UniProtKB/Swiss-Prot annotation:
Taxonomic path: Bacteria, Pseudomonadati, Pseudomonadota, Alphaproteobacteria, Rhodobacterales
Keywords: Cytoplasm, DNA damage, DNA recombination, DNA repair, DNA-binding
CDD domains: UBA_RuvA_C (cd14332)
Region feature Domain III, mapped onto this chain: 171-224
Name of the protein in its database record: Holliday junction branch migration complex subunit RuvA
Gene: ruvA
Sequence segments annotated as region (Domain II): 65-143
Gene Ontology biological-process entries: DNA recombination; DNA repair
Record's GO cellular component terms: cytoplasm; Holliday junction helicase complex; Holliday junction resolvase complex
């Protein structure tokens, strides 16, 4: 199983990239969102990967974070959602947006992904709603992979033929998982907590952990 590919970005296609790992090129299919975030050609890149095996085809699908990879695997458990459909959903919504849509039962947002019809979107929401809290709580493992050091130049090539790698930006911390953990410690059921946190995060995307907890508690408070 190939779980991670790190090397030099050698080619960028409409739905895939070619990553050179010490002279071996790996074709990795990525979502539109991930493709847009790729560095320039000749720069270091690293992706978590999932190997999808068919009778006559092996394909690698790449993800910037482990949580996005896990969402892709979960999406493919839904009948009618294949690897490319899962990538379309993640490309349209991202991992957090997918989690929020499923938790809130928002099939229309799922349907906004290319190639996803209303029946499939509704099935995704119904089948995965109870499983969303567990993945949302994986926030500690959502950090994006930092590009590895570039491989040593191959014989016959100069080090100047590769661009210098840029220092990776520090990943934005996930406050969702911390808020979910706090609500769980307060005794709230995972599904209820996930729905409240998802709604709060959707209304205030830049909220920190404390703000998410306060907003979620207001949503969970008994209505008079």
């Amino acid at each position: 199983m190939i779980g991670k590919v790190a090397g030099i970005l050698d080619f960028r296609g409409p739905d895939h990239v070619l990553i050179d790992v010490r002279g071996v090129g790996y074709i990795v299919y990525v979502s539109d969102r991930t493709l847009a975030s790729m560095p320039g050609l000749g720069e270091a890149v690293a992706l978590y990967t999932e190997l999808v095996v068919r009778e006559d085809l092996l394909q690698l699908f790449g993800f910037p974070t482990m949580i996005e990879k896990e969402w892709h695997r979960l999406l493919m458990t839904v009948q009618g959602v294949g690897a490319k459909a899962g990538m379309a959903i993640l490309g349209a919504l991202g991992a957090e947006g997918t989690a929020r849509a499923i938790t809130l039962g928002d099939a229309r947002s799922i349907q906004a992904a290319p190639g996803i019809g209303p029946k499939i979107a509704q099935r995704v929401v119904l089948e995965l709603k109870s499983k969303a809290p567990a993945l949302m709580a994986m926030g500690g493992g959502t950090a994006a992979l930092a590009p590895s050091e570039p491989p040593e130049p191959q014989p016959g090539t100069s080090s100047g033929s590769r661009r210098k790698t840029r220092a990776p930006e520090p990943p934005r911390p996930s406050h969702t998982a911390d808020a979910l953990s706090a609500l769980a410690n307060l005794g709230y059921q995972p599904t209820d907590a996930a729905q409240a946190v998802a709604q709060a995060a959707g209304e205030s995307p830049d909220a920190d952990t404390a703000a998410l907890i306060r907003a979620a508690l207001k949503l969970l408070a008994p209505k008079s």
